[in-house]
Amino acid sequence: IASLMGLSLAKYDSVAVPEQSKGQVTADIKGFNEMGLKGPELLRLMSTGVVEFGTATLSYFASDNPINEAIDLAGLAPDVQTARAVTNAFEPVYARLYGEGNNVKLLGISTYPAQVLFCNAEIKGLADIKGKKVRTSSRTTAEFVEALGGSSVTMAFGEVVPALQNKVVDCAITGSLSGYSAKWYEVSTHLVALPINWNQQIHAVNQKAWDKLDPNVRTFLQANVKTLVDNIWDAAARQTQEGYDCNTGAAACPFPVKGKMVLVQPSDADRALLKKVTQEAVLPKWAARCSAQCVKDFNATVGKTLGVTASK
């Protein structure tokens, strides 16, 4: 497992699952760092059975197949309800893809809190990205920033604080609560409360390992993963708001340390610009690198849900 949400999974699997199964089902949870993994190799390891159960961010697999970007294209889901609807719509496509090509059974898809823009100088809206250097963490967010006239910069999460502090970058995109936890509020001044993307993650299992389990255990695990995924989506919505509150010092922040950032509320013009850039730049670039079947599946699911069309 990996990530902030991975911690939720670890607690759930190591405590809740044994309790609810009365000790009949237990799990040995290991983080990527403990296993010497970076993330992108997880799908291959699950496919071969080296790792039986795993969870990882879909964007890790984007370089292997652009279809893994489909539900998290920058600007596609400006709120958590849309993100969940998009995810649910496309989940059967992923289930088929992983099952047929990788011997992996998809159990569910959860998410991080909203990925939003932190800047170290005044920003009034998305249009102000023009001319700015912005740290991005995926190909689709890089294309989004560049379409707005900004320069995309790739750097590790741990390098962002000094980069913002020393003006190496003007802005950076991360989860609203992740940025708070890393004290980005100490080196940035403005936070734009408009989700750019979400970083959904898959929960999956090697198919052969799954088939060997007792049918009652499979039913139990499937039901519990569904509960876990629902809980993580609820937590992501809550933590997105907590990130806004705590970075800006709002009274609603549940943590003792509060930042003093300015919360920039998106205007109608911001939302329109987000939609325009996604449809005119992000979506066409993604469609160009994904297969014809991939684009067809997108249009039949996500496209139908949102009223958008991707074209090769």
Question: Where do the PLM segments sit?
Answer:
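N-terminal secretory/targeting leader peptides
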Residues: 1-81, 99-312
